Amino acid sequence: MIKPIPRISSRRNGRIGSRKTGRRIPKGIIHVQASFNNTIVTVTDVRGRVVSWSSAGTSGFKGAKRGTPFAAQSAAVNAIRTVVDQGMQRAEVMIKGPGPGRDAALRAIRRSGILLSFVRDITPMPHNGCRPPKKRRV
């Protein structure tokens, strides 16, 4: 008889955020990637090493609810909670994408108490590159 392999841990009941808690990070970069379907918030140090991340999907939202501003707000709060505990005081914000969670994530970051040195929009804009997808007919 083959014994079933027990699951050690899963993302659902495991940790949220960073595994290393001993590092002190006074300054960092917060990347917000807001698409129409999801919002991903990644917090890195100034060298670009990921400290913490969260998305609307890992915050408990499924399906079409992941693209909402409220889901983006809770993803930003989850990502920032761990780095505030590690001592982050100043940050730069890079926002990418056209999604509805852009402003909500930025509002949640401002409310967290971290001083923002600047907010930069790094949405990639084509200089008439690839042909866009056809218009939807509903």
Curated annotation (Swiss-Prot):
Residues 9-24 have a biased composition (Basic residues). Its main location: plastid. One of its GO terms (molecular function) is rRNA binding. GO terms for biological process: translation. SUPFAM superfamilies: Translational machinery components. The keyword Transmembrane does not apply. HAMAP family: Ribosomal_uS11. InterPro entries: Ribosomal_uS11 (IPR001971), Ribosomal_uS11_bac-type (IPR019981), Ribosomal_uS11_CS (IPR018102), Ribosomal_uS11_sf (IPR036967). Keywords: Chloroplast, Plastid, Ribonucleoprotein, Ribosomal protein, RNA-binding, rRNA-binding. Residues 1-24 are annotated as: Disordered. It holds the Pfam family Ribosomal_S11. It is found in: Plastid, Chloroplast. GO terms for cellular component: chloroplast; ribonucleoprotein complex; ribosome. This is Small ribosomal subunit protein uS11c. NCBIfam families: PRK05309.1, uS11_bact. It comes from Lemna minor. Belongs to the universal ribosomal protein uS11 family. Part of the 30S ribosomal subunit.
